[in-house]
């Protein structure tokens, strides 16, 4: 650039002709899940928002350090019942299969997700569980506050710097964490 300001012409031979690179901001939408308007959180039934019916779940992932392992967290909105399962990665097919296994014995009316690409198979999950899927607005994780609160409680047991690349024998700890969270006294439950 100094050569250009001094009146020289050598900058024209450079690949970018001396221009600074700009970050592509239009590519951000490709990293989020596009959902239909009828699946927005704003159209979710009032009974879900008021927490009067059992069977409405919020689902999220907690990612281990260096992307090594993922913890699938499902929280029922009324009872605050928690279900946890360990996954090796957050590929959409594996996540969908895990949600189906995790909630197959539960009453499931609705599922609430964020807009991550790991939920691309939400239709498959909804069909298998006989539920309806709803999605938060982009970058609005507080719209599924029950599961976000639970993620914070889980981080008291599993630190952010901790990898989730566990052996099968270590799943005992996951069951222990789930039991502790489910038996935890809560003011909201009376």
Where would I find each of the regions flagged by the language model?
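Basic, flexible linker segments flanking DNA-binding modules
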Residues: 1-49
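Two-metal-ion RNase H-like nuclease active-site motif
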Residues: 54-64
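Mobile genetic element proteins and their domesticated derivatives, centered on retroelements
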Residues: 60, 74, 80, 99, ...
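Active-site beta-loop-alpha junctions of metal-dependent nucleic acid enzymes
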Residues: 63-67, 84-106, 110
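Short loop/turn microsegments at loop-to-beta-strand junctions
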Residues: 70-71
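A short acidic, amphipathic alpha-helical/loop segment
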Residues: 98, 123-125
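Acidic/histidine-rich, metal-coordinating catalytic segments
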Residues: 106-121, 139
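Charged alpha-helix within mobile-element recombinases
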Residues: 107, 126-190
